[in-house]
């Protein structure tokens, strides 16, 4: 008799803000500006094993609002949205896409809300982050890693 095949297990244990910072270097004068700022977004993901089947995934966004004409930063907000995930019975070759695509897709709506809420509470109009295709970013990183270092393990950090 064959042993029953164990089903993959994926559980969201916790979603939390790991780190959050806001800088308004030119307050209060910046609140008198009428120019619409240029918004720049930098996005990164990382993951690590906490223990055994428990993983932490972090999606980091740095949003900079700059007054282009005056080359002045209105505000800079950086948020690290994290999650703890229990992943069991997933084949080794499938764990990286779970950590690099599925988990960031789960965390991103929380990150978007954290950024928007922080910016609004700081006295600025909300910044709404557009959806991000983490699968495309993950695949691009895989291709870049395969071309640049075919014998090295892939770094899961993504930049957008």
UniProtKB/Swiss-Prot annotation:
Record's keyword terms, sorted: Chaperone, Cytoplasm, Protein transport, Translocation, Transport
InterPro entries the record matches: SecB (IPR003708), SecB-like_sf (IPR035958)
GO CC annotations, alphabetized: cytoplasm
Pfam family membership, one: SecB
Major site of localization recorded for this protein: cytoplasm
Subcellular location(s) per record: Cytoplasm
Gene Ontology BP annotations: protein folding; protein tetramerization; protein transport
Transport is among the record's keywords: yes
Highest taxon, organism lineage: Bacteria
Subunit structure: Homotetramer, a dimer of dimers. One homotetramer interacts with 1 SecA dimer.
The family this protein is said to belong to: Belongs to the SecB family.
Functional description taken from the UniProt entry: One of the proteins required for the normal export of preproteins out of the cell cytoplasm. It is a molecular chaperone that binds to a subset of precursor proteins, maintaining them in a translocation-competent state. It also specifically binds to its receptor SecA.
Record-linked NCBIfam families: PRK05751.1-5 (NF004394), secB (TIGR00809)
Protein name (record): Protein-export protein SecB
Gene that encodes the chain: secB
């Amino acid at each position: 008799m064959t042993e029953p095949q164990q089903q993959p297990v994926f559980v969201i244990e916790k979603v939390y803000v790991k780190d959050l910072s806001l800088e308004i270097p030119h307050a209060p004068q910046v609140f008198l500006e009428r120019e619409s700022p240029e918004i720049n977004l930098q996005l990164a993901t990382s993951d690590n094993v906490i223990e055994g089947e428990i993983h932490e995934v972090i999606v980091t966004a740095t949003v900079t609002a700059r007054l282009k004409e005056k080359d002045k930063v209105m505000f800079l907000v950086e948020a690290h949205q994290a999650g703890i995930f229990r992943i069991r019975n997933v084949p080794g070759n499938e764990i990286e896409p779970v950590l690099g695509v599925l988990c960031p897709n789960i965390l991103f709506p929380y990150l978007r809300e954290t950024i928007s809420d922080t910016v609004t509470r700081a006295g600025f109009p909300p910044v709404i982050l557009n959806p991000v295709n983490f699968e495309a970013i993950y695949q691009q990183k895989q291709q870049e890693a395969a071309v640049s270092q075919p014998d090295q393990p892939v770094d899961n950090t993504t930049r957008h």
